[in-house]
UniProtKB/Swiss-Prot annotation:
The gene is aroA. Monomer. This is 3-phosphoshikimate 1-carboxyvinyltransferase. Its EC number is 2.5.1.19. Phosphoenolpyruvate binds at residues 22, 95, 123, 169, 346, 387. One of its GO terms (molecular function) is 3-phosphoshikimate 1-carboxyvinyltransferase activity. It comes from Legionella pneumophila (strain Corby).
């Protein structure tokens, strides 16, 4: 078992980049694989989750070179060129891989099966299997959870699906199926979710219409190979944004971070809490906005986090809770029940961990209350969740004594270089088994 010890620091200084965006990396493989021609992807995240997606397409006959120095070259086979995988597709810890692949595979002529690790096998899949079945797909789950069995050769028909809650994975799953369906597939969103798939469709020259929260796609299009530069992942940058905000005397710069407006909840929430975050040198990598982030220490205050921020910061809440633990006053969050359905029950994991470190935190069914103060040293269990592990590693920097975090191996799913990157900024994090 891999564990971390994170020791208190004086302050954080320096300049870093973070690995390529995980959401965009997954999608670059998917669309590159079904494109006509070759795609060259730079900035690819070679974490275990994205490698699971890459290997899935290799098993379906797609030639993919790399990753080599974050570059991947994909020799696309076109929309109808995938071959039946010889084995069950193992998505590892990656819900994104499973849900997006399910949409694509539901439209193929061959049968397939998707499985994953112990954590993924507990995650809800009816949210994709039901609308796919409405389209005519034959998708079977095990009591609503993986593994997923998909019978190929089914004729799909477009549907108008009103999203019951914000979910980029469900939306993307249905858009991928809609690329093969008879007629139009329309998806109506009542709350904003990540729009990387829609941007990626444009990058690969596939026609998609977006107006007033309605996305429309049909099968009358092809993806075409392209060159793509992937920005740094704001979900990975979030750990250091919070760290610099709560560690007195800190002053750091994070270069080349994706600032897609469906992902910047972390910046809005921390700014509302009083953080000193400057967004510099704004530009674009293709369809995706990018900037450099300059963060300096500032005393934070507790806030009631608006429900509208939940889908814009869903993956960043564990480390936002660390910021709340260091803020003056109370921070509350509601409307975030989805956090209980992630790689772990993130509300439960954070409440337990914060209480272990002397911070008063209470969990609700859909959120949390945290009374800010000071973080003590101690030992917490990440429950095998990469974001919980990294969040408590950040807490160690400002704790009164070292924080030991157990069960950290899954950090490799999203941020394999986390410890190395952190220590550039003068963290004191050690790994041990």
């Amino acid at each position: 078992m891999l564990n971390f010890i994170s020791k208190p620091v004086v302050c954080l200084k320096g300049e870093i980049t973070v690995p390529g965006d995980k959401s965009i990396s997954h999608r670059s493989i998917i669309f590159g694989a079904i494109a006509i021609g070759t795609s060259v992807i730079d900035g690819f995240l070679d974490g275990e989750d994205c490698i699971a997606t890459l290997k899935a397409f290799q098993s379906m006959g797609v030639r993919i070179e790399g990753p080599d120095k974050q570059r991947v070259i994909i020799h696309g086979v076109g929309k109808y060129g995938l071959k039946q995988p010889q084995n069950i597709i193992d998505c590892g810890n990656s819900g994104t891989s499973m849900r997006l692949l399910a949409g694509l595979l539901a439209a193929q002529q061959f049968d397939s099966q998707l499985t994953g690790d112990e954590s993924l096998l507990k995650r809800p899949m009816l949210r994709i299997s039901r609308p796919l079945s409405q389209m005519g797909a034959d998708v079977t789950t095990q009591d609503g959870k993986p593994p997923i069995l998909i019978k190929g050769g089914k004729k799909l028909n477009g549907i108008h699906y009103v999203m019951p809650e914000a979910s980029a994975q469900v939306k993307s799953c249905l858009l991928l199926a809609g690329m093969y369906a008879e007629g139009q597939t329309k998806i109506t969103e009542n709350a904003v979710s990540r729009d990387h798939t829609e941007r990626m469709l444009r990058t690969f020259s596939y026609p998609v219409q977006i107006q007033d929260g309605v996305i429309v796609i049909d099968r009358n299009g092809e993806c075409h190979g392209t060159r793509l530069n992937i920005p740094g992942d704001i979900s990975s940058a979030a750990f250091f944004i919070v760290a610099a905000s709560i560690t007195p005397g800190s002053d750091i710069l994070i270069r080349n971070v994706g600032i897609n407006p469906t992902r910047t909840g972390i910046i809005h929430i921390l700014t509302e809490m009083g953080a000193d975050i400057k967004v510099l040198n704004q530009r674009a990598y293709g369809e995706e906005p990018v900037a450099d982030l300059h963060i300096r220490y500032s005393q934070l205050k507790g806030i009631d986090i608006p429900v509208s921020m939940v889908p814009l910061a869903i993956d960043e809440f564990p480390v936002i809770f660390i910021a709340a633990a260091c803020a003056q006053g109370k921070t509350t969050l509601h409307g975030a029940k989805e956090l209980r359905l992630k790689e772990s029950d993130r509300i439960g994991a954070m409440v337990d961990g914060l209480n272990q470190l002397g911070v008063h935190a209470e969990g609700f069914d859909d959120g949390i209350l945290i009374e800010g103060g000071s973080i003590q040293g101690g030992e917490v269990n990440s429950r095998g969740d990469h974001r919980i592990a990294m969040s408590f590693a950040i807490a160690g920097a400002v704790a009164s004594a070292p924080v030991t975090i157990k069960n950290c191996a899954n950090v490799a799913t999203s941020f394999p270089s986390f410890v190395t990157t952190a220590n550039i900024l003068h963290f004191q994090i050690e790994e041990y088994s």
